[in-house]
């Protein structure tokens, strides 16, 4: 794998040439609001047509199927555009290997305190191969169904949104709680878990869902790259983020980020495609607050530093003043933005956590002390918002989603590298200008 070299986008890209008649194609299904919504909003403002996708559905433990007519109608209404109804579920956790139980079936009845239970890896590998074949066939069908929806001469922007891949076995959820929120006796070392068979299964599943899907997309859509049309690919990565901790630009990361190894594979697939002449970029985006953040407490700590980046880039800019005002309105009576930043900095800039701020060796595993310090900082900062369901971090996330969408749309027109970091500096510049 190519060693990581820090390649941040520093300057605002010029306005793109995407416009009316061009098509943005989602490869992955939208559930709730997240980064992809910012790019969709920017594309629609440019006049682009948006075409969506689905991962399909399962009825209980039944086989994967397309959306039913009511599900399909509801999905198209929610997207506000057409959806290609080919089930693109990636991964292999429910995949029967042909002559034995699926990985999830192997784990049926395993208790959380038996997380070191061994798996039959010959069955796991056969299930993985079967899942990969299923996805490749589905992606080819997706590309064939998509082709008539792309007008002749239209430019196309593919947006890879596939991520995740936690195996759907009951044993995992209590383990995830211990891994990401456990302190004291409930702490579970991410390194120890990652070395177990359950951890290895997670790693393989993440790679199939988060990373290999990008390669499958590029391969299946080769036909659309023929001719004079401009075809670009973007994907959402994460590889830490540079923020202002105090007054110092600092690369930092959420720990433990178990999908990190799969995100590295995603970057590698983009580099391989770039060398083959495919214009694509994985954008390593900042941390935001999403529906899943309740499990990953602490991921939002670096987000508060966006306020400091806005102050540095344009302290009196209308966007800076508006965002600060909206954030202040969400504070508890005894909270302040200055207090929020000070408490977040106490974790982000603490000397004892400097080893976790090294790009080299990323992703990093947790320690009991580091996780406890991060969770304590998260709890203290969250308490400064009046409503935990509408926190300051949520407002800053909405700003980041908007800016990242605009940055990705513009940068994708003439991409200059297969991997680009988006730090708070360029996000703040985009919001201000």
Feature map (PLM): residue ranges:
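Structural motif
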Residues: 22-23, 154-157, 232
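Canonical Rossmann dinucleotide-binding motif of NAD(H)/NADP(H)-dependent dehydrogenases/reductases
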Residues: 3-61
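Short acidic, low-complexity segments enriched in Ser/Thr/Gly/Pro
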Residues: 91-123, 167-200
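Catalytic loop of short-chain dehydrogenase/reductase
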Residues: 58-66, 170, 174-277, 282-301, ...
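Glycine-rich phosphate-binding loop and adjoining beta1-alpha1-beta2 segment
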Residues: 49, 53-127
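A glycine-rich helix->loop->beta "capping" turn
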Residues: 100-160, 165-166
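Long, compositionally biased intrinsically disordered regions
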Residues: 2, 6, 13-14, 299-433
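Short alpha-helical segments and helix-capping/turn motifs at coil-helix boundaries
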Residues: 8-12, 34-39, 138-148, 156, ...
């Amino acid at each position: 794998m190519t060693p990581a070299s820090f390649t941040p986008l520093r300057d605002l890209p010029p306005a793109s040439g995407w416009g009316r008649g061009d098509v943005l194609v989602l490869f992955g299904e939208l559930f709730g609001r997240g980064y992809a919504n910012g790019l969709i909003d920017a594309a629609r403002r440019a006049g682009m047509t948006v075409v969506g996708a689905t991962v399909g559905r399962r009825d209980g433990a039944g086989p994967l199927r397309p959306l039913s007519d009511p599900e399909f109608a509801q999905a198209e209404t929610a997207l506000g555009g057409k959806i290609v109804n080919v089930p693109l579920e990636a991964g292999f956790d429910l995949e029967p290997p042909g002559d034995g139980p699926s990985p999830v079936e192997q784990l049926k009845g395993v208790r959380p305190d038996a997380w070191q239970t061994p798996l039959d890896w010959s069955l796991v590998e056969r299930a993985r191969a079967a899942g990969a074949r299923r996805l490749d066939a589905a992606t080819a069908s997706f590309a064939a169904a998509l082709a008539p929806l792309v007008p002749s001469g239209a430019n196309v922007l593919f947006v890879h949104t596939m991520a995740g891949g936690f195996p759907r076995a009951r044993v995992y959820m209590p383990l995830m709680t211990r891994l990401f929120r456990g302190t004291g006796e409930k702490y579970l070392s991410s390194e120890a878990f990652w070395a177990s068979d359950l951890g290895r299964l997670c790693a393989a599943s993440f790679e199939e869902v988060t990373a290999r899907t990008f390669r499958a997309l590029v391969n299946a859509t080769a036909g659309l790259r023929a001719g004079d049309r401009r075809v670009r690919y973007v994907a959402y990565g994460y590889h830490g983020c540079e923020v202002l901790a105090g007054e110092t630009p600092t690369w930092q990361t959420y720990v433990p980020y178990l999908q990190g190894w799969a995100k590295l594979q995603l970057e590698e697939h983009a580099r391989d495609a770039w060398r083959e002449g495919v214009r694509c970029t994985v954008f390593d985006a900042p941390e935001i607050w999403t529906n899943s953040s309740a499990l990953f407490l602490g991921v939002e700590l670096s987000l508060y530093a966006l306020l400091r980046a806005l102050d540095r880039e344009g302290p009196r800019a209308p966007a800076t003043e508006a965002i600060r005002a909206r954030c202040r309105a969400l504070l508890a009576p005894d909270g302040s933005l200055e207090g929020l930043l000070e408490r977040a900095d106490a974790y982000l800039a603490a000397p004892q956590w400097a080893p976790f701020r090294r790009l080299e060796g990323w992703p990093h595993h947790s320690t009991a002390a580091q996780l406890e310090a991060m969770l304590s900082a998260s709890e203290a900062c969250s308490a400064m918002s009046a409503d935990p369901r509408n926190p300051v971090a949520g407002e800053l996330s909405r700003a980041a989603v908007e800016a990242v969408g605009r940055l990705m749309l513009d940068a994708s027109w003439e991409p200059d590298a297969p991997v680009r970091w988006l730090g708070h500096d360029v996000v703040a510049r985009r919001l201000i200008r």
